[in-house]
Each structure stands twice: as C-alpha cells, then as structure tokens.
C-alpha cells in the first residue's frame, strides 16, 4: 500500500470545530439517496474526511460501523484525486437497506462530483 492510499489521522476531521466549520459554511453540498456531503476548502494540502452517522438513522451499532467502514474505505481509495477540502459525509435513512456494492457506487458518484468542482483560491 503506497503512502497515498493510507488513511492516517491527519486525513480525518476529529474536532467539533472542524465539523462545525464545514457544516455551518460549506462551499458546496451534494447528496444522493444514501449520503449527503458538505465540503469546504482547507489549508492542509490534503483532503480530510469527517463522518456523521447518527444512531437516529442507524439504530444498531453494527449497521453504523459497517457504513463508517465503507465510507472510510471509499475515501481512502479516492483521496488522491480529490481536492484539498474538508468533507463531512452524512447518511440518509435508505442506507440501512442498501448492500455494500450499492453504497460504494453511491459514494463514487459523490467523489466524482467533488473531483469535477473547481478549486477556489489556487
């Protein structure tokens, strides 16, 4: 596994203020049936990921963990082609009934949308 394919701590949003910065003033948002993504340019020089998978949407821990693993893996594989933005991925109710392949496909659509956005300020 090359360095670009890893998912280190620096590629994650960990603090509340990092999440709030993206969610309160996103540069853009997009969504599909399963996920919603808010994004904002960062100064880190790399894309970073934050997850919002609430118990209110997925009641069972095993469901929440499965969805989080899928989101992280999809981001890890695609992060080399993404702009230097902070991404917060939230889930929608339909995610509970979807299989893994469907979720990966839905995330790929969202990452493709992110790659197609113009990078501001550079």
Curated annotation (Swiss-Prot):
Covalent S-S links between cysteines: none
Gene Ontology terms, MF aspect: 3'-tRNA processing endoribonuclease activity; ribonuclease P activity; tRNA binding
UniProt-listed Enzyme Commission number(s): 3.1.26.5
One Pfam family named in its UniProt record: Ribonuclease_P
SUPFAM superfamilies: Ribosomal protein S5 domain 2-like
One of the record's GO cellular component terms: ribonuclease P complex
Keywords from the named record: Endonuclease, Hydrolase, Nuclease, RNA-binding, tRNA processing
PROSITE patterns in the cross-refs: RIBONUCLEASE_P
Catalytic activities: Endonucleolytic cleavage of RNA, removing 5'-extranucleotides from tRNA precursor
GO biological process entries: tRNA 5'-leader removal
Database matches in Gene3D superfamilies: 3.30.230.10
Lineage top rank: taxon: Bacteria
EC category: hydrolase
Free-text function comment from the UniProt entry: RNaseP catalyzes the removal of the 5'-leader sequence from pre-tRNA to produce the mature 5'-terminus. It can also cleave other RNA substrates such as 4.5S RNA. The protein component plays an auxiliary but essential role in vivo by binding to the 5'-leader sequence and broadening the substrate specificity of the ribozyme.
UniProt subunit comment: Consists of a catalytic RNA component (M1 or rnpB) and a protein subunit.
HAMAP family referenced in this protein's UniProt entry, alphabetically: RNase_P (MF_00227)
Family to which this protein belongs: Belongs to the RnpA family.
Name used for this protein in its record: Ribonuclease P protein component
Organism in which the protein naturally occurs: Halorhodospira halophila (strain DSM 244 / SL1)
Native organism taxonomy: Bacteria, Pseudomonadati, Pseudomonadota, Gammaproteobacteria, Chromatiales
């Amino acid at each position: 596994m090359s360095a670009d394919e890893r998912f280190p701590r620096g590629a994650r949003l960990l603090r509340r203020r990092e999440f709030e910065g993206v969610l309160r003033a996103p540069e853009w948002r997009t969504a599909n049936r399963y996920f919603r993504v808010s994004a904002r340019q960062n100064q880190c020089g790399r894309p970073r990921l934050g997850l919002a998978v609430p118990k209110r949407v997925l009641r069972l821990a095993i469901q929440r963990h499965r969805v989080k693993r899928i989101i992280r893996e999809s981001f890890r594989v695609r992060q080399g082609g993404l702009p230097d933005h902070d991404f917060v991925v939230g889930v929608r109710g339909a995610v509970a009934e979807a299989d893994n392949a469907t979720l990966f496909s839905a995330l790929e659509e969202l990452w493709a949308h992110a790659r197609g956005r113009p990078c501001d300020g550079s």
